[in-house]
């Protein structure tokens, strides 16, 4: 998981992603998940700059947020169609695999599928 309050490309424990660059060598894909859907494009772009061109990126945003007092809170604050529009932005930023993480539903994935069908025509 990447930290949304830190600069782009920083894990929750404060470790910058670039410190893992050598570990990515030979990977078929590297994924980012459990990041708020609206902020994921920037993270995908950052990761894309760290990877070889033949490495796919998986992007799985969430619908919810972390609360320091009660922990994780799922929310339906992002409608499936809006989430799908974010997923298209992740693709534009370099993701080749998109899906959903915490708080997403089958309706969310269906909306992504529909948007991808529209885009491909």
Place the predicted regions along the sequence by residue:
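Domain-level signal for soluble alpha/beta catalytic cores
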Residues: 1-121
